[in-house]
């Protein structure tokens, strides 16, 4: 067998995005693919060699900074939301310099914070949520103590797409003089382009850092996560010496770092512009409403009215439904609390995809 044929055979075992209604990633935009090819051999881990790519990343940081209302953005493109969350909390720990550091997170926070506790030696405290699944700010405050280095808010929770009360968390962070990290891995490139955007970003003075992933709603090629700090002082807190490279210090978590994510993210945001991104988000929200209407017709109610293009529907048969759909090569996910089936309506989830899905979903319900 020819090696390319062998590769194709393996690739064909993958499920195409047209059958995937659970992923927060999507088919890359054509301009992202073109940019990826152009920068395929670049390594931002050696900035003295790839000077143009370094300059491009700086431009991308300013572009994202504009979206997030930050005049002095400092950060970089990384592997994804997990790495970005690690770096946000690592910077907070290093800046705060407390002996037995802890952070307070919502119980709805991404599982990457489990890894953060293990890797950074930071104690994780979990605050409960209200009836709308937003973090309870009162509980956050009660859990804080003299060793708290950061509190965390989510702008687009993984399971429900909910936005925590970042404005109130920001005021609390300022009052208690701790850092506020906002995990907007998903919502960071959704909320700014909505009709009535919630102020989740650096316009709140207490926000220190934001996770934002262009390889999600930014339609960049994978990997293209992002961590953005309010200013460079947080990057300085992450630096280690790199004596044998073309730069003396490095603030990133990984050494070797592809420039493809930078190029593809910049290409999409620059070519589409603000209005183009608004159109992408508008279309995803429209299709989310279509999905909700179809599911309601079948007797399924959303856990909460969708805030963005993530929606979960209550059912005690979540696991059975997921497994039967998977046998039909449809991919959805489930959540445990409350029991529900979960959907993410990405750009590839078109009205036609929803129609095809509902047709097969009806067959599952008849079994």
Swiss-Prot record:
User: GO: which molecular function terms?
Assistant: aspartate 1-decarboxylase activity; pyridoxal phosphate binding
**N6-(pyridoxal phosphate)lysine: residues carrying this PTM:** 216
SUPFAM superfamilies, alphabetized: PLP-dependent transferases
This one is known as Probable L-aspartate decarboxylase
Q: Which InterPro entries match?
A: GrpII_AminoAcid_Decarb, MfnA, PyrdxlP-dep_de-COase, PyrdxlP-dep_Trfase, PyrdxlP-dep_Trfase_major, PyrdxlP-dep_Trfase_small, Pyridoxal-P_BS
- Reported cofactor(s): pyridoxal 5'-phosphate
What EC number(s) does the entry state?
Answer: 4.1.1.11
Which keywords are on file for this protein? Decarboxylase, Lyase, Pyridoxal phosphate
Q: Which PROSITE patterns match?
A: DDC_GAD_HDC_YDC (PS00392)
Query: Where would you find the membrane-spanning parts of this chain?
Result: none
Query: Known NCBIfam families for this protein?
Result: tyr_de_CO2_Arch
Q: In which pathway does it act?
A: Cofactor biosynthesis; coenzyme A biosynthesis
The encoding gene: mfnA
Entry annotated with the keyword Lyase: yes
In its UniProt record, which GO terms are filed under biological process?
Answer: carboxylic acid metabolic process; coenzyme A biosynthetic process
Organism the protein comes from? Archaeoglobus fulgidus (strain ATCC 49558 / DSM 4304 / JCM 9628 / NBRC 100126 / VC-16)
Give the matching Gene3D superfamilies.
Answer: Aspartate Aminotransferase, domain 1 (3.90.1150.10), Type I PLP-dependent aspartate aminotransferase-like (Major domain) (3.40.640.10)
Q: Outline what the protein does.
A: Catalyzes the decarboxylation of L-aspartate to produce beta-alanine.
> So what does this thing catalyse?
L-aspartate + H(+) = beta-alanine + CO2
Family of the protein in this entry:
Belongs to the group II decarboxylase family. MfnA subfamily.
């Amino acid at each position: 067998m020819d090696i390319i044929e062998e590769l194709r055979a393996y690739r064909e075992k993958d499920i195409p995005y047209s059958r995937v209604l659970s992923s927060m990633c999507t088919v890359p935009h054509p301009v992202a693919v073109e940019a990826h090819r152009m920068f395929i051999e670049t390594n931002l881990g050696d900035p003295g060699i790839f000077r143009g790519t370094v300059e491009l990343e700086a431009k991308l940081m300013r572009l994202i900074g504009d979206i997030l209302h930050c005049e002095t953005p400092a950060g970089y493109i990384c592997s994804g939301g997990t790495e970005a969350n690690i770096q946000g909390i690592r910077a907070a720990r290093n800046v705060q310099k407390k002996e037995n550091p802890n952070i307070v997170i919502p119980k709805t926070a991404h599982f990457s914070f489990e890894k953060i506790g293990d890797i950074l030696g930071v104690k994780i405290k979990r605050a409960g949520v209200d009836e709308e699944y937003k973090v309870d700010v009162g509980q956050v405050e009660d859990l804080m103590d003299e060793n708290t280095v950061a509190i965390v808010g989510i702008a687009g929770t993984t399971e429900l797409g909910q936005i925590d009360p970042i404005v109130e968390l920001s005021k609390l962070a300022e009052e208690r003089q701790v850092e506020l990290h906002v995990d907007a891995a998903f919502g960071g490139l959704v909320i700014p382009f909505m009709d009535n955007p919630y102020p989740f970003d650096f316009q709140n003075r207490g926000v220190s850092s934001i996770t934002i992933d262009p390889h999600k709603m930014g339609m960049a090629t994978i990997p293209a996560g992002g961590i953005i700090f309010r200013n460079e002082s947080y990057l300085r807190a992450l630096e280690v010496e790199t004596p044998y490279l073309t730069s003396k210090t490095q603030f990133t978590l990984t050494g070797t770092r592809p420039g493809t994510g930078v190029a593809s993210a910049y290409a999409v945001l620059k070519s589409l512009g603000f209005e183009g991104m608004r159109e992408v988000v508008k279309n995803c929200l429209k299709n989310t409403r279509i999905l909700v209407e179809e599911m309601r017709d079948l007797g399924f109610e959303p856990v909460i009215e969708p805030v963005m293009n993530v929606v979960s529907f209550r059912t005690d048969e979540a696991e059975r439904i997921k497994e039967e759909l998977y046998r039909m090569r449809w991919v959805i996910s489930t959540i445990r609390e409350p029991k529900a089936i979960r959907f993410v309506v990405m750009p590839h989830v078109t009205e036609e995809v929803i129609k095809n899905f509902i047709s097969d979903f009806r067959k599952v319900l008849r079994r």
